Design a protein with these regions (language model features):
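Conserved N-terminal entry element of GNAT/NAT acetyltransferase domains
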Residues: 1-11, 31, 189
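Conserved GNAT-fold acetyl-CoA-binding loop/helix
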Residues: 25-48, 93-94
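Conserved beta-strand in the GNAT
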Residues: 62, 69-78, 113, 118
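Conserved catalytic-core motifs of GNAT/GCN5-like acyltransferases
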Residues: 80, 149-151, 164-183
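Conserved GNAT acetyl-CoA-binding A-motif
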Residues: 112, 124, 140-151
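Conserved acetyl-CoA-binding loop-helix of GNAT-fold acetyltransferases
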Residues: 125-138, 161-165
């Protein structure tokens, strides 16, 4: 299958949103402040459209086939920017719902961080996830980072195995919204 990896564009947002939800699961409800799936997806799509939060399309790269179908996504950014991106979201939730939430830090300042990666169900097993990870590594190296990191749910054994094959090391346990994750880091040359 032919595809290209490129910076997400505004017209990709409607295809990006369900893949982010598939990857982050229940975290999406916390990020949006919603309890209903339909409303949560609408709010999550608004976050993807917004330029000032971690899940913005500006932090997202897509694997596109020849007909502009999104086959996979990777959301990534400078670890130092994570807190800044989250403050904007926390402020938005406070203004909209009168609700204060605190979003957990997910990366160290010296890391280029993969926040979310997901390949659509019909494109799995074609190596797209591996290529998205290689792309992230190239981006991080180009930007001068010596570390590429991600967090993976403890129970996602296949994903952990893939990341290990790609050179990531499990460095420490991590908690995100009271759920157990493993922080994994790949040192770049």
């Amino acid at each position: 299958m032919d595809y290209v990896i490129q910076q997400a564009k505004h017209e990709n947002i409607i295809q990006i949103t369900p893949l982010i939800y598939e990857a982050i699961g229940d975290i999406a409800y916390n990020l949006t402040g919603e309890t209903n799936e339909e409303t949560m997806l609408e709010k999550l799509q608004m976050l993807v459209k917004d330029e000032n939060n971690r899940h913005s399309y500006l932090n997202t790269f897509v694997a596109l086939d020849g007909s502009s179908k999104v086959l996979g996504i990777i959301v990534m950014y400078d670890g130092k920017k994570g807190a800044e991106l989250d403050r904007a979201l926390e402020k938005s939730l406070l203004e909209e719902y009168g609700r204060t939430i605190s979003i957990d830090v997910e990366a160290y300042d010296d890391e280029y961080y993969i926040d979310t990666i997901c390949v659509s169900s019909e494109a799995r097993g074609l190596g797209i996830g591996t290529e998205l990870l290689k792309f992230a590594e190239e981006q991080a190296a180009t930007l001068g980072y010596s570390k590429l990191s991600l967090n993976v749910e403890v129970v996602k054994l296949k994903a952990r195995a893939l990341y290990k094959r790609m050179g990531f090391e499990e460095t420490e346990p991590w908690t995100i919204i009271n759920e157990p994750f493993i922080h994994m880091v790949k040192r770049l040359k």
